[in-house]
Design a protein with these regions (language model features):
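N-terminal leader/targeting segments
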Residues: 1-83, 90-92, 203, 207, ...
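Membrane-interface helix/helix-cap signal primarily in integral membrane proteins
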Residues: 53, 57-258, 396, 401, ...
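Feature for secretory/organellar precursors and membrane-associated catalytic proteins
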Residues: 100-104, 368, 588
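Conserved hydrophobic/aromatic pocket- or pore-lining residues that grip, position, or stack substrates
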Residues: 215, 235, 263, 318, ...
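Hydrophobic alpha-helical segments of integral membrane proteins
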Residues: 204-222, 231, 239, 247, ...
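Alpha-helical transmembrane segments of polytopic membrane proteins
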Residues: 24-34, 371-372, 474-479, 533-538
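Hydrophobic alpha-helical transmembrane segments in multi-pass membrane proteins
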Residues: 3, 11, 186, 239, ...
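Non-globular, low-confidence helical/coil segments that flank catalytic cores
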Residues: 98, 142-145, 149-152, 156, ...
């Protein structure tokens, strides 16, 4: 199963790297190849000879890869068909539908998703989901009304097809919109014509959205303008829109951003709590005159409780990719236990991988997918073979304790000897407790080491940096958030108002203490290693180095594994040759940003729009410079004071060292 799920995932990844969807000839060839692979797998996989079985196994994996490629292509073709006709771009259309998700408010208005039921343009394949903005223009303009998830509206909107900036090393916005099913962007063009309709959207998704909105409102009422309210909201319902930029920077520079996203740690904790509650209630059913454990074992009820509880919390988090991965692993292990089967942890991870990609084949385009699955895979790989040794060691200790107790009872000693025996037993228990504590700390350190080196190449690929303080910061932050902050915040989620307010206040205070520690760690000298975006060869060599380093003790030349990282950490220079220059005009929308490079110098002409517009300085220019490996600009030239040209300069000056600034202001 592991190989088939991996091959299926490889096919999905291959499709997402294509510039165009396959045509009719490719579909015909793929179907023929798939049928041939299935025939070979069925005919030769059960053979007696090892070579015959190997051919059948390879054919089965090829069929799985082709199935993944074809499935992702079919899903993409179906979704791309829901496109806004070009002739309707920039024209007013009246749409009727419901608000979906959590609206986001800022100084310019409100942004929200809108599920369309009807449109007056009578377009048959109209985009099912729109990303809309309800702007506030001028001082006299009225603020947008409060938009509640599930409320139905009739709006006059002006739409356009999704179009993102195309730049090297910058997040692909179009892929993100496609993954979320957003096939048109726009704004409310006539606010006075907006009409709230009777009734609400039905369904589980709408109910969950309304619950998330109520919880966010309760947290806002309890915390007000608290500095770290956004992190509390993120831990409670998975919405990260309210996290301030300063907190985001500290979390990013210390490698702890994963802690404020509801991930496997939180879903597993909630699932374990629900399993404990369900199993405990089932075992005590005799107190109410029921013998339910005789009908269904309490262990199976606990497994079912873990699945249901984990699903509820993952839904509350918006079912992001890490939460999906954790819940599918929980569900796979729970279903296997309920059916009387035992699955290896790697098989559980493989099942979760296949389920996530079947539900959302675009998940491979998000950093969370790779970081989440690779982190768990690294932990499983690093701990493989050690759990059996640990169990044998614990069994030997238990046998020694039992033998000692039996010898002690066989010949009762005198009173002083009894005290000496009691002291000896106490010392033995203390040694065992200290030994268990040391082993747990060692196992936790080994897991943290595995995650750190496994995610470093991916962090360099996605964020063009490696946080050097990540291991130290995570060693403190993970137990702090997992054992203190998250349970307290979840207690606030469960408690009714106003009993929830003290929990949220205490959770915010604990977050504030954590952020002070992380801020000190981030400010302790050079804590972030900036690297250019690695190429395919550097990533492949780094992956080999990771696997090599995580091999068991005694593996040949295990200490030489860091040599495979050299192409990643000491990349080839990207500057143009001597005597030449390279000019790159960045796609920043309205405005300009041009990078001019020579063999030893770099000049940036304009920095694009600022936060009042598309914020291209922070979203486009800075990530591009980091991905290109530009650590210092010799000159920043600002042509004139227009915000489309000078608005992004503060973001560049804050993120990149600049020798001189020349401006026509």
């Amino acid at each position: 199963m592991r190989a088939r799920c991996g091959a299926f995932a490889l096919g999905v990844v291959a499709l997402q790297q294509q510039a165009a969807l396959p045509g009719a000839a490719a579909w015909a060839g793929g179907a023929l190849a798939f049928g041939l692979c299935v025939w070979l797998a069925l005919a030769w996989r059960g053979g007696v000879r090892a070579r015959t079985r190997s051919i059948g196994f390879c054919a089965c994996c090829c069929a799985a890869a082709l199935a993944g490629f074809g499935y992702a292509a079919a899903r993409a073709q179906w979704r791309l068909a829901d496109a806004l006709p070009a002739q309707w771009e920039g024209r007013d259309i009246v749409v009727t539908g419901a608000v979906r998700g959590l609206p986001s408010r800022d100084a310019n208005g409100t942004r929200f998703l809108f599920d369309v039921d009807e449109n007056d343009a009578r377009i048959a394949r109209f985009p099912a989901t729109l990303s809309l903005a309800w702007y506030t223009f001028g001082r006299s303009a009225a603020s947008p009304p409060e938009l509640v998830p599930g409320d139905r509206w009739r709006l006059r909107v002006r739409l356009k097809r999704p179009h993102g900036n195309a730049n090297f090393g910058v997040r692909d916005a179009e892929a993100a919109w496609l993954a979320r099913g957003i096939r048109a962007l726009g704004y409310v063009s006539a606010a006075h014509d907006a009409q709230r309709l009777a009734g609400r959207a039905s369904g589980i998704a709408a109910m969950v959205d309304r619950l998330r909105a109520r919880l966010r409102g309760r947290i806002a009422d309890a915390l007000g303008d608290a500095a770290h309210r956004g992190i509390v909201v993120a831990l409670a319902i998975g919405a990260q829109d309210d996290i301030v930029d300063g907190d985001r920077r500290i979390l990013r520079d210390t490698g702890t951003s994963h802690l404020v996203a509801i991930s496997g740690l939180h879903v597993g904790m909630v699932g374990g709590l629900c399993a404990w509650l369900a199993g405990g209630f089932w075992r005590r059913s005799g107190y109410v005159g029921r013998n339910w454990p005789l009908v269904v074992p309490a262990q199976k009820v606990a497994a079912l409780g873990a699945i249901v509880g984990g699903a509820g919390y993952a839904a509350l988090a918006g079912f992001n990719v890490p939460a999906q991965r954790a819940w599918w692993m929980l569900a796979a292990a729970g279903v296997a236990y309920l059916s009387g089967r035992s699955l290896a942890p790697s098989s559980v991870l493989a099942a979760a991988l296949g389920c996530v990609l079947i539900v959302d084949p675009w998940a491979v385009t998000s950093p969370g997918f790779w970081l989440s699955f690779c982190a768990v895979a690294a932990i499983l790989f690093a701990s493989s073979g050690r759990s059996a040794a640990r169990e044998a060691r614990d069994l030997d200790e238990a046998r020694g304790s039992i033998d000692g107790a039996c010898r002690e009872r066989a010949s009762p000693p005198a009173c002083p000897a009894r005290w000496r025996a009691a002291c000896a037993r106490a010392r033995m228990r203390a040694r065992r407790a200290i030994g268990r504590l040391v082993r747990r700390v060692r196992d936790a350190a080994r897991a943290q080491f595995a995650v750190t080196i496994a995610l470093a190449p991916l962090t360099a690929l996605w964020f063009a940096q490696i946080p050097l303080t990540g291991p130290l910061a995570n060693a403190f932050a993970i137990p702090w958030v997992g054992s203190l902050v998250t349970p307290i915040v979840l207690a606030g989620v469960v408690l009714p108002a106003p009993l929830d307010a003290p929990a949220y206040v205490l959770g915010e205070a604990l977050v504030a203490a954590l952020m002070r520690f992380l801020e000190a760690a981030a400010g302790a000298g050079r804590t972030v290693w900036m690297l250019p975006a690695p190429g395919g060869f550097a990533l492949a060599m780094a992956a080999v180095g990771v696997v090599w380093a995580l091999m068991p003790r005694g593996w040949p030349l295990r200490g030489a594994a860091p040599l495979a990282w050299l192409p990643l950490v000491v990349p080839a220079p990207l500057a143009p040759p001597d005597g030449t220059f390279r000019l790159t005009a960045l796609d920043v929308g309205q405005g300009s940003a041009v990078l001019i490079e020579t063999a030893r110098h770099a000049l940036l002409f304009d920095a694009g729009p600022g936060p009042e517009a598309s914020n291209a300085g922070e979203r486009v220019v800075v990530p591009f410079l980091r991905a290109r490996g530009v650590r210092m600009l010799d000159t920043l030239v600002v042509s004139h004071a227009d915000s489309d040209h000078a608005g992004g300069a503060p973001a560049v000056l804050e993120a990149i060292a600049v020798a001189q600034v020349v401006g026509g202001l």
